């Protein structure tokens, strides 16, 4: 099972005059932050809850703008990229970003937010024997642009960001440089992240997450068969349906929200929650998504012996222009001439012109790779506890050690790439 995500953020100049940096050769400058285990004032559980709050707020906007379509994204990738930008933001621009990420600045100092992210990303970067998680950021900077040393050092130390120089006066070459980097970091699952660069581009920030996990209890490929997946009460498609017999797995029936929740664990420190709303109840479940709901589901899970569990095998991908979505969460100024990103270069002449998020989700028998009444006889939970994920459902992948939501997906059409 794989989940692969990449995000690209393009920063352009409002006016000329911020240029002057020594040489134009490609340079790579990497510094990994060695976080001491003395912790941070923003503990991991609080940060996880805040990130989940942002994740569900963003999910609701995506669902509203993309009805009846697959949704796949990594809230952690998006919030980490925005947090890096906030290192160079000031005034109202800074407040918009951090408050848009659901931080209360009267309760949590900005420095603690960055230390919290740094601690989280450092823990995620520890290689695991069973679950593979790779996350990182990179700054591609116009070869003549002078970046403030403080911004670059903080991006390195807290967010493990790599720094490269690029010649944006040659947009095609710069685009290839960035897209090749992202492709290599995501096992070649994400290609063409950035497009339409022009000579006004001064900096591109990319953030990526690659996740690959093996099911603790894998499906047998010999049991996979063609079966119906219901798009709505009138339409269905044939999909490869995976099947597993006689398993005991964490299970919860939420009568209040009319949905069934099952947890399938990966080997190692990750798990996936699958949420199957009753027919016609998806909007009710979506409206209730918040950190408290996720906590309730996880705390209510109990081992349940199941006769059979059926889950579609699929590979889907999505891409979003976050420039059209984040303003609805209060993050507006970075895309306008009012932006104050002077902590990056020392001058107020930068704006974010593009923010693109791409995600790929593969679910198969061995695991995950990552790069929603009438007229239809839906097969639902029965007395013998057989569960069919044969209609629209939600999926939430979490890192169990730091209790952080890594990815969220809504599967409406398993065959639509």
UniProtKB/Swiss-Prot annotation:
- Sites carrying a glycan are 38, 104, 184, 269, 390
Where, subcellularly, is it found? Secreted
- Asked if the keyword NAD belongs to this entry, the reply reads no
Q: Identify the keywords attached in UniProt to this record, alphabetized.
A: Glycoprotein, Protease inhibitor, Secreted, Serine protease inhibitor, Signal
What does the record give under GO molecular function? serine-type endopeptidase inhibitor activity
> Can you tell which superkingdom this protein's organism belongs to?
Eukaryota
Gene Ontology cellular-component terms for this entry are: extracellular space
Instruction: Establish whether keyword Secreted is in the entry.
Output: yes
**Pfam families assigned to the protein according to its UniProt record, in alphabetical order:** Serpin
Task: From the UniProt annotation, give the residues forming the signal peptide.
Answer: 1-22
Locate the region RCL: 367-392
Q: Where is this site: Reactive bond?
A: 381-382
In the record, the note on similarity to other proteins reads: Belongs to the serpin family.
What's in the misc comment field?
A: The single human alpha1-antichymotrypsin gene (SERPINA3) is represented by a cluster of 14 individual murine paralogs.
This one is known as Serine protease inhibitor A3C
- Source organism: Mus musculus
- Gene it is expressed from: Serpina3c
